[in-house]
């Protein structure tokens, strides 16, 4: 059976925590930031866990993590 390939696009966007959860960065933090408040920018900088509905799809694309 051939080796499973890791999706590099997904590997760059998601990390696995020590407890096994998938972590992601929040969106809307790349440009058009001057209209956003400091509080909003600060909260967008934090990481959050992936929704339960998406975990199966991400795990299939990252077979060795």
From Swiss-Prot:
User: PROSITE patterns this protein is in?
Assistant: RIBOSOMAL_L35 (PS00936)
Where are the stretches annotated Disordered? 25-45
Annotated compartments = Plastid, Chloroplast
Pfam families, per the entry: Ribosomal_L35p
Under Gene Ontology molecular function, one entry of this record is: structural constituent of ribosome
Cellular component annotations (GO), alphabetically ordered = chloroplast; large ribosomal subunit
Q: Which UniProt keywords apply?
A: Chloroplast, Plastid, Ribonucleoprotein, Ribosomal protein
Could you say which residues form the signal peptide?
none
Ranges of biased composition (kind: Basic residues): 25-44
- A Gene Ontology BP annotation from the UniProt entry: translation
Q: What is the protein's major site of localization?
A: plastid
User: Could you tell me which InterPro entries the record lists for this protein?
Assistant: Ribosomal_bL35 (IPR001706), Ribosomal_bL35-like (IPR021137), Ribosomal_bL35_CS (IPR018265), Ribosomal_bL35_sf (IPR037229)
- Family to which this protein belongs: Belongs to the bacterial ribosomal protein bL35 family.
Q: Which HAMAP family match?
A: Ribosomal_bL35
Protein name according to UniProt? Large ribosomal subunit protein bL35c
Q: Which organism is it from?
A: Pyropia yezoensis (Susabi-nori)
Q: What is this protein's gene name?
A: rpl35
């Amino acid at each position: 059976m051939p080796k499973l390939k890791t999706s590099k696009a997904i590997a760059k966007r998601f990390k696995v925590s020590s407890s096994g959860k998938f972590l992601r960065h929040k969106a809307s933090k790349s440009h058009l930031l001057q209209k956003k408040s400091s509080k909003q920018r600060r909260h967008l900088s934090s990481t959050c866990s992936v929704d339960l509905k998406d975990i199966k799809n991400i795990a299939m694309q990252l077979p060795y993590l």
